A protein has these predicted regions:
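Short secondary-structure boundary/capping segments
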Residues: 55, 87, 123, 157-162, ...
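Conserved SAM/AdoMet-binding glycine-rich loop
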Residues: 41, 299-455
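Structured alpha-helical segments in the cores of large, soluble enzyme domains
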Residues: 26, 142-145, 149-152, 171, ...
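Single conserved hydrophobic/aromatic residue that forms the stacking wall/gate
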Residues: 470-482
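Flexible loop/turn segments at secondary-structure boundaries
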Residues: 46-49, 78-81, 114-116, 149-152, ...
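Core structural elements
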Residues: 146, 269, 448-458
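Acidic, low-complexity intrinsically disordered segments
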Residues: 1-30, 35-36, 42-46, 56-60, ...
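Hydrophobic alpha-helical scaffolding
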Residues: 48, 109, 161-164, 230-234, ...
């Protein structure tokens, strides 16, 4: 494979944050002897992509296969994209600084809708034809995955295949098919046909998209163009999640990234059923890692990475049946080491005095709660089964235990929303701040901090609200932003 480093290195002195483009980070795996090379791409800058837990997991599982190498690539900052084009340098991988177009397969994660144009920029910068039907035998297979792959049709013209669902088992299995057939000299079309037979894999070129009326009558939005293809694509599920280690050797970046800490996934799935939440629908059923697994992963991960903060990640971490035991044991193991424990997804109705003390650990950071809506009526509509009393009780417990910073997350534009619901956000936030203040000793109130975030509701595929579209041409009421 072509090594672009001699051409890239002279450009780094003028680049913003040049460490974004350096290889050989601590924990980086490079397998030059592999006979099949796969590049995992996050369509945004290194700081965002390297913090992505899915990318870390999938690079590890592919690299664990003998003869397969997984490398990483990220979309450079806009100024660097311009520089690469001016110098005629295509997008490259981090590990070997090789052009993406020279890999056997390129996987692009689809984290959110606003990354769609970044996907096209990634392909263009890599010199890979944008449209799947324009690619030839020498081009890599371009596969998509991630949250937006659950609604693949908007992206279908640009991808050869999609991995729908969790990728720990599906991705290596699909790549093994590609590897075997490429070694046999199979044509691109034959490889895609074989991939379509694998559970959880969708090949758009082998299906026809049905119009709405036709789809309702047939019971499916897609029609196979060949016999033997599944009418519905079922998501892949990693059934071995509970037994798998919560931490595996990971890359410690040279430069600061978002969520720059040790991340240990303790729980996958959510049983709460909020009607707007795609992740809660996608990652069912709920699966837990044991307390022993989690604690061992935290202790080992902190020792091997040097981080002083650990995040126990999931969609709803305080719903773990052993969360109290986990936090108690981690606090004991990290006593005196200055380690901060972060539990980013905290349910208001399961956060009390005991939980506040356990989460505090050696350092007290910030707490994040998500009432989502400003009134109880709207919370009931979206099936967010928490009350104002739950919020106030959680704040009382946390701030009496010594916390001084809090974030509240809301959404605007939800179905059935009225102006009263919008005003309710401001009212609830003010009353929440008053409770924080009342629970804090007067001499410490100057350090109180509350931030309120309001995200715009976006209908997500595979959720009860997926068809709750906003018709811009027919506004029902004004949206005031100040």
């Amino acid at each position: 494979m072509t090594d672009l480093w001699p051409r890239l290195e002279p450009l780094l002195a003028a680049a913003e944050r040049p460490a974004r483009y350096l290889n050989h980070e601590f924990g980086c795996v490079y397998k030059p002897e592999a006979d099949f090379r796969f590049c995992m791409v996050y369509p945004d800058t290194y700081e965002l992509g390297q913090a992505n837990q899915a990318l870390r997991i999938l690079v590890n599982v592919v690299n664990a296969v003998d003869g397969m190498a997984a490398e990483r690539a990220f979309l450079p900052a806009p100024a660097m994209c311009d520089t690469l084009r001016a110098e005629g340098i295509p997008l490259f991988s981090i590990e070997s600084c090789a052009p993406l177009a020279e890999f056997d397969a390129v996987g692009i994660t689809l984290p959110h809708e606003l990354a769609a144009t970044n996907v096209l920029e990634t392909l263009d910068l890599a010199g890979i034809p944008l449209h799947a039907d324009e690619r030839v035998e020498s081009d890599p297979l371009v596969v998509g995955g991630g949250p937006c792959a659950y609604n693949p049709e908007p992206y279908a013209p640009f991808f050869d295949a999609f991995s729908i669902g969790e990728g720990e088992e599906a991705l290596p299995r699909g790549l093994a098919v590609v590897r075997r057939l490429r070694a046999e000299g199979a044509a691109r079309a034959d490889i895609l046909r074989a991939l379509a037979d694998e559970p959880g894999w969708y090949v758009p070129s082998l299906y026809r998209w049905r119009a709405e009326d036709e789809a309702q009558e047939a019971g499916s939005w897609i029609e196979p163009l060949e016999e033997g293809l599944p009418l519905r694509i079922e998501k892949s599920l990693f059934e071995g999640f509970a037994e798998s280690p919560g931490w595996e050797p990971c890359i410690v970046p040279f430069t600061e990234v978002v969520h720059d800490r040790l991340n240990v996934e303790i729980l996958r799935g959510c049983a709460r059923g909020c009607r707007f939440c795609q992740a809660g629908m996608m990652y069912r059923p709920v699966r837990e890692r044991s307390a022993d697994n989690v604690v061992e992963s935290v202790v080992q991960g902190l020792a091997e990475t040097g981080y002083d903060e650990v995040s126990l990640t999931s969609l709803s971490s305080t719903d773990h049946s052993q969360i109290a035991s986990i936090l108690t044991r981690i606090n004991r193991a990290c006593d005196g080491k200055g380690v901060r424990i972060s539990v980013p997804s905290q349910r208001l109705d399961s956060f009390g005095v005991d939980m506040a003390e356990l989460v505090a650990g050696q350092k007290k950071g910030g707490l994040t709660f998500a009432p989502e809506a400003g009134t109880q009526r709207l919370r009931d509509v979206i099936n967010k089964n928490v009350t104002e009393d739950d919020l106030f009780g959680a704040l009382d417990a946390a701030f009496k235990a010594g916390w001084r910073r809090c974030k509240l997350y809301f959404m605007i534009g939800l179905p059935t929303e009225t102006d009263d619901d919008i005003k309710g956000i401001a009212s609830l936030a003010q009353r929440a701040y008053d409770r924080m203040k009342a629970a804090t000793p007067p001499e410490q109130r100057g350090s109180l901090r509350m931030s309120v975030s309001c995200a715009l509701f976006v209908p997500k595929a595979q959720t009860p609200f997926q068809l709750s579209l906003i018709h811009i041409s027919e506004p029902t009421r004004p949206l005031y932003i100040s």
